[in-house]
């Protein structure tokens, strides 16, 4: 059993490493926040699918990675912004645009986990979890 101090960074690192190794799927310990991150990645077209699985009594989230016809993933970079030691909060007017709108930022807001674009539209700010492009 691994005890990590930053489960979101662990999840993002597992996805990043699996993409670099050209794996078709990757498993990570499940949580509500990681499930929401996977949901957003699927909605935005960065992963093929995800599902909750249970192996040996442990709840996992299985992420199915997506590759184009040239075997290149839509995810080229994943950056963790807010960390346990240095939280980053922004208002609705300060939500970062990633690569001029080509990438996404993912935030936790009072209205749930959403992309920076959705948060701007709804006029809410929150904690910037990561940027993906």
From Swiss-Prot:
Keyword Ribosomal protein tagged: yes
PROSITE patterns: RIBOSOMAL_S8
Keywords per UniProt: Ribonucleoprotein, Ribosomal protein, RNA-binding, rRNA-binding
Domain of life: Bacteria
Chain segments annotated as transmembrane: none
A GO CC term assigned to this protein in UniProt: ribonucleoprotein complex
Keyword rRNA-binding recorded: yes
GO BP term, pick one: translation
InterPro entries: Ribosomal_uS8 (IPR000630), Ribosomal_uS8_CS (IPR047863), Ribosomal_uS8_sf (IPR035987)
Pfam family name, one: Ribosomal_S8
Entries under SUPFAM superfamilies matching the protein: Ribosomal protein S8 (SSF56047)
GO MF, any single term: rRNA binding
Record-linked NCBIfam families: PRK00136.1 (NF001109)
Family: Belongs to the universal ribosomal protein uS8 family.
Role this protein plays: One of the primary rRNA binding proteins, it binds directly to 16S rRNA central domain where it helps coordinate assembly of the platform of the 30S subunit.
Record note on quaternary structure: Part of the 30S ribosomal subunit. Contacts proteins S5 and S12.
Name of the protein in its database record: Small ribosomal subunit protein uS8
Lineage summary: Bacteria, Pseudomonadati, Acidobacteriota, Terriglobia, Terriglobales
């Amino acid at each position: 059993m691994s005890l990590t101090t930053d489960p979101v960074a662990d999840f993002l690192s597992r996805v990043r490493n699996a993409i670099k190794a050209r794996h078709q799927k990757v498993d990570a310990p499940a949580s509500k926040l990681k499930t929401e991150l996977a949901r957003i990645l699927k909605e935005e077209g960065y992963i093929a699918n995800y599902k909750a699985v249970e192996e040996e009594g442990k709840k996992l989230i299985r992420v199915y990675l997506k590759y184009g016809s040239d075997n290149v993933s839509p995810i080229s970079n994943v950056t963790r912004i807010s960390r346990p030691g240095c939280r980053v909060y922004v208002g609705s007017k300060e939500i970062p645009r990633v690569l001029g709108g080509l990438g996404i930022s993912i935030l936790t807001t009072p209205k749930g986990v959403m992309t920076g674009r959705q948060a701007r539209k709804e006029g809410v700010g929150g904690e910037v979890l990561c940027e993906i492009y």
